[in-house]
């Protein structure tokens, strides 16, 4: 074999090995033809801008070659604490060229996102009293960490009814990335916000509230809207001097997504404490995002009797088979539930000054978000340190938490 031929084979192998991966770990909820492209960490801002210009030229060239009416191309671009990525809709030829680009780490399909809760009925409200007492025997709420003064809460959800009386004029509309209805026409976002920051139903009773709408009236959105929401929140907090003094509740889910997990972690690194729902499929949270994201605080739902709610996802405390199988993709799936919080029959705010009961890890997560805000403000902790502190304070009282899963229940450290 000639030296030239050997060199050609070598470079062909090198090119294949170093090409970016197209991650299609799970096809459920995939939006056809829509993608998220994530750059390598070493890529500079100038290189990213150059890549975007290259992408636009490549997309136009391939459209002309195929004589196709398909024209969407580049969507949003993001830089979240150095995590650079973009969304868009591209033909197969363009996707292949993106995968072969030296600065691209991976590409994955855009997927649907939706609320992570189920609605139930009843006539009970008990969550606040439970998280403020070590023993499950009291019906009052006690807090020695204040009421969230100087904390800002960002709710990424179906929007928030900023005129809800329980928010006492502290809420403002941030951005609508879902539709043309600048209010919460689903109710999920207002309910979770009430548990975080309502005057009667919430923990951060004096915090500022910001609505980021990424889900429509039916509770559906997608990954692109989600990352747009994260990016907007980081920029807003930065402009207003709120980094290190903000919290975010994410009671949403999609099938496992490396892009969602990475963007969520980087958003917390930028300066916002983040609590995420484990999900309501009664299975391992490792199969869903952002519940499988490392470093952020993943929350399971507990009942009034301190058991794992029947619907709540759980999480293994070590390397799972899925983590081994998908290790080469770089997907972080060995991080799941950090602690539990009340998530069954939780009463909170709804649009139009109504209240209602909901159940789900969506309802548990706002409790952690709220207590996290109190701890961060009072103890001066960095956002990425808050979850560890919450786990230190938590009580090991959850019965039957799930296979190899923590038994820790959220506690606000009141001393009661």
UniProtKB/Swiss-Prot annotation:
State the active site: 157, 188, 362
Q: Where does this polypeptide localize?
A: Secreted
Q: Could you tell me which residue ranges the Inhibitor I9 domain spans?
A: 35-115
> What top-level class of enzyme does the UniProt entry assign?
hydrolase
Q: Which domain of life is it from?
A: Eukaryota
User: Cell inner membrane: present as a keyword of the record?
Assistant: no
- BP GO annotations: proteolysis
| One function term, GO molecular function aspect | serine-type endopeptidase activity
Q: Write the record's keywords in alphabetical order, separated by commas.
A: Glycoprotein, Hydrolase, Protease, Secreted, Serine protease, Signal, Virulence, Zymogen
Question: Would the keyword Glycoprotein be found if you checked this record's keyword annotation?
Answer: yes
Where is this protein primarily located? secreted
Provide the residue ranges of the propeptide in this protein: 20-116
Protein EC:
3.4.21.-
Signal peptide coordinates: 1-19
Question: Would you list which residues are glycosylated?
Answer: 123, 136, 150, 249, 305, 334, 353, 404, 412
CDD domains from the UniProt entry: Peptidases_S8_PCSK9_ProteinaseK_like
Q: Supply the InterPro entries for this chain.
A: PCSK9_ProteinaseK-like, Peptidase_S8/S53_dom, Peptidase_S8/S53_dom_sf, Peptidase_S8_Ser-AS, Peptidase_S8_subtilisin-like, Peptidase_S8_subtilisin-rel, S8pro/Inhibitor_I9, S8pro/Inhibitor_I9_sf
* Ranges where the Peptidase S8 domain occurs: 125-416
- GO CC field: extracellular region
Q: Which PANTHER family match?
A: CEREVISIN-RELATED, PEPTIDASE S8
**Family according to the record:** Belongs to the peptidase S8 family.
Role according to the record: Secreted subtilisin-like serine protease with keratinolytic activity that contributes to pathogenicity.
- Quote the protein name from its UniProt record: Subtilisin-like protease 12
Source organism of the structure: Arthroderma benhamiae (strain ATCC MYA-4681 / CBS 112371) (Trichophyton mentagrophytes)
User: Its encoding gene is what?
Assistant: SUB12
């Amino acid at each position: 074999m000639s030296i030239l031929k050997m060199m050609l084979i070598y470079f062909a192998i090198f090119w294949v090995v170093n090409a970016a991966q197209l991650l299609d770990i799970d096809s459920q909820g995939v939006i056809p033809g829509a993608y998220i492209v994530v750059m390598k960490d070493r890529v500079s801002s100038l290189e990213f801008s150059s890549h975007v210009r290259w992408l636009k030229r490549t997309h136009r060239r391939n459209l002309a070659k195929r004589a196709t009416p398909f024209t969407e191309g580049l969507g949003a671009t993001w830089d979240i604490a150095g995590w650079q990525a973009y969304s868009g809709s591209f033909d197969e030829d363009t996707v292949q060229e993106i995968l072969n680009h030296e600065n691209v780490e991976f590409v994955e399909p855009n997927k649907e996102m939706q609320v992570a809760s189920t609605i139930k009925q009843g006539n009970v409200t008990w969550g606040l009293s439970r998280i403020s007492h070590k023993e499950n025997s009291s019906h009052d709420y006690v807090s020695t960490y204040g009421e969230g003064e100087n904390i800002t809460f960002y709710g990424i959800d179906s929007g928030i009814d900023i005129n809800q009386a329980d928010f006492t004029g502290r809420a403002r509309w941030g951005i609508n990335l879902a539709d043309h209805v600048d209010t919460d026409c689903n109710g999920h976002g207002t309910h979770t916000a009430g548990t975080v920051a309502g005057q009667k139903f919430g923990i951060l009773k004096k915090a500022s509230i910001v609505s980021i709408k990424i889900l429509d009236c039916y509770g559906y959105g997608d990954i692109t809207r989600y990352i747009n929401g994260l990016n907007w929140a980081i920029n807003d907090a930065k402009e207003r001097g709120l980094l290190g003094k903000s919290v975010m509740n994410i009671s949403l889910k999609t099938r496992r997504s490396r892009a969602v997990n990475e963007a969520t972690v980087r958003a917390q690194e930028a300066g916002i404490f983040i609590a995420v729902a484990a999900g309501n499929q009664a299975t391992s949270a490792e199969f869903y995002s952002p519940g499988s994201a490392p470093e952020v605080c993943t929350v399971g739902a507990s009942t009034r009797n301190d058991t794992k709610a029947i619907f709540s996802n759980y999480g293994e405390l070590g390397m799972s088979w899925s983590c081994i199988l998908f290790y080469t993709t770089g997907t972080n799936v060995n991080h799941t539930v950090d602690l539990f919080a009340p998530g069954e029959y939780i009463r909170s705010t709804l649009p139009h000054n109504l209240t209602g009961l909901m159940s789900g890890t969506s309802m548990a997560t706002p409790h952690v978000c709220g207590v996290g805000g109190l701890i961060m403000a009072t103890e001066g902790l960095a956002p990425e340190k808050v979850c560890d502190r919450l786990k230190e304070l938590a009580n090991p009282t959850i019965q039957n938490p799930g296979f190899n899963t923590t038994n820790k229940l959220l506690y606000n450290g009141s001393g009661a």
